[in-house]
Amino acid sequence: MAVTHTAADVTAATTMTNAVADIEQETPEIEKERQLAGVGTGTGAGANNKKKPHDHALASILGPAFVAAVAYVDPGNVAANITSGARYGYLLVWVLVLANAMSVLIQYQSAKLGIVTNKSLPELLGERMSDAGRFMFFMQAEVIAIATDLAEVIGGAIALNLLFGLPLFIGGLVIGTISTVMLWFQGGKTQTTFERIIIVMLLVITFGFIAGLFVAPPNPGEVVKGMIPCFQGADSVLMAASILGATVMPHAIYLHSTLVNDHYAGGEKPSIKTQLKGSKIDVAWALLLAGTVNLAMLVLAANSLHGMSGTDSIDGAQRAITQVLGPVIGTIFSIGLLASSLSSTSVGTYAGSEIMHGLLHVNAPMWACRVVTLVPALIVLWFAKDPTQALVIGQVVLSIGIPFAVIPLMRYTHDKELMGKWADGTAKHVIFMIVVALIVALNVLLIVLTLMGRA
């Protein structure tokens, strides 16, 4: 295992080094390349970038995918992974690996769309819809944004309650305030600062959810065995559907196509070819990190919480971790949960703002977008007896919104008129169709089973 891991690291490092060298050597000729490819120059967020180049080549590689990746380690994922490991042990490890592989493809496709067209997915949707269609699409996207923020704010409120004993409603206010302050750095010359804040948060999340494995290392043989696809009864199939169905977050798809252009707000863009090469590395490393965190949560629960009762809620899981692994690990877990909430709710609001801009051509203040999605979460925290139930409801709402994001993405990346020579070939398009069909089918299954009272 150690030798394989080292070889993979060397290969990844070599790939990154080569990409950085390409970026440093290549003279950007963006407009010429777009014309030769048959692609419009666009009027998106990153259309007028003629400022000085980034000081370091790495700045043109890493960032956007790491911001999008926080959607994959939000409190909803924490709840799903901990529950899966506690109930079924290592059984569904293979589901997480498969889910992460699909995520890499989808997030890269979103980045590719933004790089080639110089527009975001919401902008492209808005250009192809009537006024009524744009408004209806925006309304469903806004409901999805509210459902997303619901889970993230509740998770943060629970973390503050576990760490400091704050009432859930007060904790929700604190999360809303801090995440709004973080959003001050989003956009313009401070966009890179915002990306770095999110990356630091992602590293805190990683440490928070992996620390327990150093205290109670898992059985490598059991982890490998979990890579073999199998189930144990209908309930485990439902759990797998929940994990896979929750893998792709609609707002992460919408946002990534914006992030790749916002990333260059403070510098000159490399060529499309170089951006695509850099984006592959960005997505691979970011989702490798996010996938590792998710796997660590499941393995931690499988190794230390398997068979224990009361682990079907985030606070119950934290108390069980504290009981089994000690208060230090329990506290570190809570800190990871807090970082997960703060980063994911900031990114969710960012996505909501870009969706509004792309579909309605309205540049609303970020604080206004923050208030719209925060208020429903605070209402739930004030009135609900069991806020964890809101996470389940929110997940179902998210499932409804996924087809509206992935299906247009699949169509646009195969559109030669839109993408020029960068359009997906037949083989890649077929693979993407299969992935999209699987994700949509699993989300429909999750919705139906939830409405039937079986989820």
Identify what each model region corresponds to.
Residues A2-G76, A132, L203, M239, ...:
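Membrane-interface "cap" regions at the ends of multi-pass membrane proteins
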Residues G40, A80-G85, Y108-G133, F185-T193, ...:
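Flexible loop linkers connecting adjacent transmembrane helices
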Residues H56, T83-Y108, P122-G126, G133, ...:
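Extracellular loop-to-transmembrane helix junctions
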Residues S179, L183, L202-I228, V237-T258, ...:
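Hydrophobic alpha-helical segments and their helix-loop junctions in multi-pass secondary transporters
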Residues A68, V95-R128, F137-V143, M182:
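Juxtamembrane transmembrane-helix boundary signature
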Residues M136-E142, L163-F185, L203-G208, N363-I379, ...:
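Transmembrane alpha-helical segments of multi-pass small-molecule transport proteins
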Residues D131-A132, F169-L173, W285, V328-G330, ...:
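Loop-to-transmembrane helix boundary motifs in multi-pass membrane proteins
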Residues S103-V116, V260-Y264, E268, L288-G316:
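Extracellular/periplasmic helix-exit of transmembrane alpha-helices
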